[in-house]
């Protein structure tokens, strides 16, 4: 972190201005720049190209040094479009990595990768800035407390609980509900959460970013009347941005979150949607830099890049960062190098299933694939652990019996297995839940279900007390009392039809 003089734009001192280079080559978003002998910029230094294009339009492109090629030449990646750049244009070495505004001034605002506001609400106070490239906290600074982070979503809290100050991944293919789930988590957690949140939109749809901004204004997380009282900072580098911006926007969001943790000593929520796009952008840049591709065409530095980002997302003795990251799974293949590399860094994984989504069960969280390091009796307690294990056992048995049911039918099963199937189908439906952010699509009001209520509901299903209720009574309800009330309504409706 550094304190800048009062100014509304980054200052390039006269000393740094003397270190000038010239563009020698432009290959899409990658520039080769020649500097005078002995004045080579460091790796990750920010370079600024200023000038005018052929029609006289002002150009201001920031790049980041990636390679020193020899012969006084460096290769840099542009953070914005390179349209209008020409060979021979002047390039200024700023002498430092890219720095972005941090602190209270960022709350309620939308930024791009360079830390520039893009919400038309005027300039941001840039007296306090921080470089986006930093080392992870030292081992002795880390905090090891274990506590549960309640989300109000039944399937998450029961089967794969989140750790406060931990890293959580939401895995799923295209169109199974990752962004809706992350928006519901923002709605449930950010509203109740006393600290601040930072949202990093990495390579996702601009429309979703706009929807989220509107949602936050409506819910009061962003206070339009008094921006300073807002609880969230938004950083967007969406699908239409060059790969350099998509590769670095996650670091910009993380830098803002680190300031709240280290300097303000707050508990921070960091949402990243989508971490796969960070890897994808790195893959594009890697190819442009001339590196030999690795497995499935990914960059050979995949593990290093992911590690340098993920190791900074951690809890220290000053404060915590709880990170929730959406992870796109290409072709629904969890063994793809991008999701497989991400798995290693997470405390909890919430895996979304296309099979459940096809059945209309939302959130489409797979109860057997989702895992958490927190699901241990010494952390969550015996009652919670036992209930979760019995739910998983029942679901697993139902999965094993599905082939037999498909070939021979339910009637060929033993009495015990038929009972297991009936309870498993009720559990499957009870794991669905109406979301606050999906009220527009479903027409059902959203429900927040506390952990104690969730455990009680599943215990009643497993004990057999609710065997007489129809399974549709458990679909898209909140707690178990709503399911019993829905069953009574269904019974009344069926009698009226007769």
Curated annotation (Swiss-Prot):
It comes from the Eukaryota. Its EC number is 7.1.2.2. It holds the Pfam family ATP-synt_ab_N. It catalyses: ATP + H2O + 4 H(+)(in) = ADP + phosphate + 5 H(+)(out). It is a peripheral membrane protein. It is an enzyme of class 7 (translocase). HAMAP family: ATP_synth_beta_bact. This is ATP synthase subunit beta, chloroplastic. The gene is atpB.
């Amino acid at each position: 972190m550094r304190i800048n003089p009062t100014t509304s734009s980054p200052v390039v001192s006269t000393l740094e201005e003397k270190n000038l280079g010239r563009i020698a080559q432009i290959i899409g978003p990658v520039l080769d720049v020649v500097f005078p002998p002995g004045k080579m910029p460091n790796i990750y230094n920010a370079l600024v190209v200023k000038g005018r294009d052929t029609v006289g339009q002002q150009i201001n492109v920031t790049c980041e040094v990636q390679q020193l090629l020899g012969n006084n030449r460096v290769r840099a990646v542009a953070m914005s479009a390179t349209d209008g750049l020409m060979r021979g244009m002047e390039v200024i070495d700023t002498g430092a990595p890219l720095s972005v505004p941090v602190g209270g001034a960022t709350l309620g605002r939308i930024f791009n990768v360079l830390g520039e506001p893009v919400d038309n609400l005027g300039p941001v106070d840039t007296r306090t800035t921080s470089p986006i490239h930093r080392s992870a906290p030292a081992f002795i600074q880390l905090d090891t407390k274990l506590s549960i982070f309640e989300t109000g979503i039944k399937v998450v809290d029961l089967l794969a609980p989140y750790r406060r100050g931990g890293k959580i991944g939401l895995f799923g293919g295209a169109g199974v509900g990752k962004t809706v789930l992350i928006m519901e988590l923002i709605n449930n957690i950010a509203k109740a959460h006393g600290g601040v949140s930072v949202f990093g939109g990495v390579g996702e749809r601009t429309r979703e970013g706009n929807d989220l901004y509107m949602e936050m204004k409506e819910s009061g997380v962003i206070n339009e009347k008094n921006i300073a009282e807002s609880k969230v900072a938004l950083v967007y580098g969406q699908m239409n941005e060059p790969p350099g911006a998509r590769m670095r926007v996650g670091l910009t969001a993380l830098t803002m979150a680190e300031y709240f943790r280290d300097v303000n000593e707050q508990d921070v929520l960091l949402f990243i949607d989508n971490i796969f796009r960070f890897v994808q952008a790195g893959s594009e840049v890697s190819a442009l830099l001339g590196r030999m591709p690795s497995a499935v065409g990914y960059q050979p530095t995949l593990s290093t890049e992911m590690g340098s980002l993920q190791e900074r997302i951690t809890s220290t003795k000053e404060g915590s960062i709880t990170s929730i990251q959406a992870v796109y799974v290409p072709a629904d293949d969890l063994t793809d190098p991008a999701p497989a590399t991400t798995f290693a860094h997470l405390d909890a994984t919430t895996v979304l299933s296309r099979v459940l989504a096809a059945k209309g069960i939302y959130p489409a969280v797979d109860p057997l694939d989702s895992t958490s390091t927190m699901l241990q009796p010494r952390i969550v307690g015996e009652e919670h652990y036992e209930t979760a294990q019995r739910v998983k056992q029942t679901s697993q048995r139902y999965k094993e019996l599905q082939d037999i049911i498909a070939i021979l039918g339910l009637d060929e099963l033993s009495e015990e297995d038929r009972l297991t199937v009936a309870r498993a189908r009720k559990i499957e439906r009870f794991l669905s839940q109406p979301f606050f952010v999906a009220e527009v699509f479903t027409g059902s009001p959203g429900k927040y279900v506390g952990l104690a209520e969730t455990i009680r509901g599943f215990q009643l299903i497993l004990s057999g007390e609710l065997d007489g209720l129809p399974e549709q009574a458990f679909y898209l309800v909140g707690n178990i009392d709503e399911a019993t009330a829905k069953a009574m309504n269904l019974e009344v409706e069926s009698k009226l039809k007769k």
